[in-house]
């Protein structure tokens, strides 16, 4: 009898643990290792909550097998060999031009190249009918995908998945605002171009023009993506932007404490830092020994993967190594590409530096002897540093990095420097390090940011899981979708009212005023001359 009751109790517990579990598909194209890791964290968090998660990784770059993206969820891998090299070439071109200032033409050219080959990869992926049918048979309850390209949402629609969640893997960019028909705050947030803390007229103009240009490009890119799906699934397949416009929730992988404060949406939820603490592992004896060096502490330096130290101008790293020599009381940990022989050779001549192609970043950031992190301001590293309370010296190169660095500067827990200063003004970077090491305000503010993030009423994990389950349980929450998403630009901004009113005002008020004023001015200035001629 006791055995019977025990089995019954276990069965009941199993039901409550797994009986309400949902089947969820996480769509994760391999656009970079950092994006694979971010999506892996999402999959793991859903799995921890008891859900049945499929992590679908499409190998755009040949990096899926070597990237430990998820710890709990088994990966389903799809190869796209035909177009892979084209995508690799685009990423390589970004790395080669990373030190150049990006004008509007270069910005547009880069986006066209990236989205064009991404759409090609999407089309190749759709040819895999075996995988499509296998996934369709799963009858997933929900779907997650990033914003870099919205191919995944067309795929989810074709699979018949009802509940869709958009992951904005970096700050909310202008074209993502455009998906939702929510006006982007170009006057205050440097989406596409750099803007100083108090933006000038020209800076705001440049940001606006770039934003309009990029949004116009995405309009045509999305039309092509729609045509790809209609070619595969029929002419009645909905426009890809219509699918995205009606996603249930937008999860923003940033934190409102460190991001630019700007207008938001009812269905937008911040989940910055999701899964970050789980990656804080032991660093091992080799790195632990390095962290003990330096009389006054350790400084960590990493420029990410796009600013590849083996392809950028070698003078960049040589310049930084010269700066390292000026801080003998501090030990520097430098991440350099595995093929960067020049940096490694030069570093052997310097006693207070350790160079490696891999460093346990989360563990380093949480180490008590770390004084500052010199970074390119990629969002993964930024979130890790924020949760560890580490002040930053940011040197942005491209993509969202400039936006991130300006937000850090504005919130007071970091110093920003320009990438060109490695070559033209290295003393500016040296001065930033000295300022960071001697001014405690940056560390104090970094600790405040950490505490605010960690002590929020609801953390990222609870927000993410509870919101996801709430939406699925209720068959979507259409009540949160903004009414403006279905309006045209003309209606949304009331241009059909404003423009006619302007012409009416011009005709009945402004035009008569100028006519009267002009006649008076003409008579007062030239009337006496005409009178004189008439008398003569």
Curated annotation (Swiss-Prot):
Stored InterPro entries: UDP-glycosyltransferase, UDP_glucos_trans
Gene Ontology terms: cellular component: membrane
Leader sequence residues: 1-21
UniProt membrane topology term: Single-pass membrane protein
Keywords: Glycoprotein, Glycosyltransferase, Membrane, Signal, Transferase, Transmembrane, Transmembrane helix
One Pfam entry name: UDPGT
Transmembrane segments: 497-517
Top-level taxonomic group: Eukaryota
GO molecular function: glucuronosyltransferase activity; UDP-glycosyltransferase activity
Top enzyme class: transferase
Primary location: membrane
Subcellular location: Membrane
Reactions this protein catalyses: glucuronate acceptor + UDP-alpha-D-glucuronate = acceptor beta-D-glucuronoside + UDP + H(+)
Annotated glycosylation sites: 52, 308
Enzyme Commission designation: 2.4.1.17
Family: Belongs to the UDP-glycosyltransferase family.
Protein name stated in the entry: Putative UDP-glucuronosyltransferase ugt-47
Species for this entry: Caenorhabditis elegans
